[in-house]
Regions:
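Alpha-helical hydrophobic membrane-insertion segments
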Residues: 4, 19-22
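Carbohydrate-interacting regions of secretory-pathway proteins
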Residues: 23-260
Length: 260
């Protein structure tokens, strides 16, 4: 009995310590954010980490909702609700320039999202014009997709950045043409009945299996050249993928809804 009590106490202490550590890191990054203008070219770039060789896709969890099955876009529409105009072939879907972003027919709040993506194997352009797209949670909160392999750009717009806010902790990008993974744990913002913010959105993100955001608190919706404040919105909204004019590919997209 004593051993059990000691084990419980130690576990509680460890969890409390981890919670304080994450909170301290979040506060530190929030303080650092104030130092930098949005898309500041002088902001330090994240250190490069080799994620290792590509790995085969993992099986889809039994309780997951498959958003893209490699065959069709029946789960998606364009931004106006019409059929999605991207090209499906060979088990992936590719952005068609000027066809517009696409979004899921279903809406989601708190979730675990898995996305696999690849930029063109023969890169063209540089900076933000090289393999640019984005994964949007609730159509408002973007994790940047970009070819960041030997391709410098502003830090808060690099691959796996919470766009316009936080660069990834490291640059874990693979070579152009290689398949990459995002695993995103997302907690939606909370608003009261008057539309006042009760709790901000948070993200934990793994890029190619490497932690790049650790329960990071978002300052508001992500945007280009702006950091707008939160505005009340529905508890659940679609996931969307961005058409930024580059032929980025996606495959094996699934989501698990989480309890609040």
């Amino acid at each position: 009995m004593v051993k059990v009590m000691i084990s419980v106490i130690l576990s509680t202490m460890v969890m409390g310590f981890l919670g304080l550590t994450v909170a301290a890191q979040t506060n530190r990054r929030a303080a650092e954010l104030k130092k930098w203008r949005i898309h500041d070219e002088t902001r330090p770039l994240p250190p490069i980490v080799d994620p290792g060789p590509q790995q085969p896709s993992l099986p889809v969890p039994s309780d997951a909702i498959v958003l893209f099955n490699g065959k069709d876009l029946l789960q998606w529409t364009n931004s106006k609700g019409a059929p999605a105009g991207w090209q499906v072939k060979d088990g992936y879907v590719e952005v068609v320039n000027k066809s517009g972003s696409i979004k899921t027919k279903r809406a989601f709040g708190d979730c675990q999202l898995h996305v696999e993506w690849a930029t063109p194997s023969e890169p063209t352009g540089s900076g933000q014009d090289r393999g640019n797209s984005g994964v949007f949670l609730m159509e408002n909160y973007e994790v940047q997709v970009l070819d960041s392999y030997n391709n410098a750009t502003y830090a808060d717009g690099s691959a796996a950045a919470i766009y316009g806010q936080y660069p990834p902790l490291v640059n874990a990008c693979r070579k152009p043409g290689e398949w990459q993974t995002y695993d995103i744990l997302f907690r939606a913002p909370r608003f009261d009945g008057n539309g006042e913010l009760l709790a901000p959105a948070r993200m934990t993100v793994f890029h190619n299996g490497i932690l790049v955001h650790d329960n990071q608190e978002l300052t508001g919706p992500t945007a280009h050249k702006a950091r707008p404040p939160y505005k009340a919105h529905a508890d659940k909204l679609p996931v969307s993928l961005q058409d930024h004019g580059n032929p980025v590919r996606y495959r094996n997209i699934w989501i698990r809804e989480l309890q609040p």
